[in-house]
């Protein structure tokens, strides 16, 4: 009987220890956030969500995602006209970025119904939201259209005013990313297609008046994203099938490219089995999250119909800072909890 009692007591302690361990694990998971689904988001209208940018909506107390909404599921569109004639979609998250719901098309006073809106970036400064939008006049079957970057402002992310077109390096500029430096200066990195699709730089003291500073990165790429994290400035550039190139700087002027790209190797998750493209980064506390898009149908085993080849999904992965480099593991669960942001 004594032996039986000791054995029973051991089992009891074992169960208690397992329960405590499970509680600790659950608490840690709760603190780091819930696991984001794969894919994180698909647009319910055109199924063509791409080029995401996230911003904290102070009035609503929720996170908003603005994104290029390509017309992926519209049949009979010739050439690349399905990526033209597009508007910017808006999705909303009330749980710190875990789940997203479609809200509306952004009402932007730029061009007409046949024109094209791409790849917005949004920053908040002194109570005003500033959007820098890529505008392409018209709808085109090829990539021949002009591109420019247009500045808009809003008090609430809903009602926008067109401030005007920026005077930059050429008539084929796109994909702005804007960041304020430690000294208060604003910088914009963007893609100039007239210069071999390399990344150029413009500078402003107030977000209103911009001076072009020429080429910032010599390598080809598009969709740059600039941010500050772990005492460095970072610039992530979409290099298509080669993944996302990562550049690091101490002054946001001289950039060193790390050897390995992000998201070049296809993942294993749903809609994530291809390389990742055109990303946004949200720094939340001491963590950073990479939001990117994929073309899930562009893999060897996928159907070759137009809709499957064209559709796109938004995904998220947490960035890590390891030995001075940025890394991420898209195959691991992404626990996410975006805090209310004072900087956006």
Where would I find each of the regions flagged by the language model?
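Bacterial N-terminal signal peptides that target proteins for export
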Residues: 1-14
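Bacterial N-terminal signal peptides
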Residues: 12-23
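Carbohydrate-active catalytic/glycan-binding domains of CAZyme proteins
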Residues: 25-344
């Amino acid at each position: 009987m004594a032996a039986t009692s000791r054995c029973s007591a051991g089992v009891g302690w074992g169960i208690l220890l397992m329960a405590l361990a499970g509680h600790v694990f659950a608490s840690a998971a709760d603190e780091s956030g819930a696991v984001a689904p794969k894919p994180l988001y698909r647009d319910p209208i055109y199924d063509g969500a791409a080029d995401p940018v996230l911003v904290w909506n102070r009035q609503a107390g929720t996170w908003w995602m603005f994104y290029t909404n390509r017309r992926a599921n519209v049949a009979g569109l010739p050439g690349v006209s399905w990526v033209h004639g597009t508007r910017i979609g808006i999705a909303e998250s009330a749980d710190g970025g875990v789940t997203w719901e479609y809200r509306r098309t952004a009402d932007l006073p730029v061009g007409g119904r046949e024109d094209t809106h791409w790849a917005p970036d949004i920053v908040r400064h002194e109570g005003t939201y500033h959007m820098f939008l890529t505008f392409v006049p018209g709808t085109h079957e090829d990539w021949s259209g002009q591109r420019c970057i247009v500045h808009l402002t809003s008090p609430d992310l809903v009602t926008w005013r067109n401030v005007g077109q920026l005077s930059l390096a050429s008539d084929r500029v796109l994909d702005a990313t804007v960041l304020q430096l430690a000294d208060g200066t604003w910088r914009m990195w963007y893609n100039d297609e007239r210069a071999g699709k390399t990344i150029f730089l413009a500078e402003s003291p107030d977000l209103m008046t911009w001076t072009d500073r020429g080429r910032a990165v010599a390598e080809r790429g598009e969709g740059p994203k600039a941010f500050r994290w772990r005492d460095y400035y970072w610039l992530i550039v979409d290099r298509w099938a080669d993944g996302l190139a990562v550049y690091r700087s101490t002054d946001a002027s001289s950039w060193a490219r790390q050897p390995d790209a992000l998201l070049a190797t296809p993942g294993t998750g749903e809609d994530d089995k291809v390389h990742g493209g055109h990303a946004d980064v949200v720094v939340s506390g001491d963590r950073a999250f990479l939001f990117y898009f994929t073309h899930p149908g562009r893999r060897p085993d996928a159907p070759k119909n137009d809709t499957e080849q064209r559709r796109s999904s938004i995904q998220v992965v947490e960035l890590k800072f390891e030995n001075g480099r940025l890394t991420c593991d898209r195959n691991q669960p992404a626990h996410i909890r975006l805090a209310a942001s004072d900087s956006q």
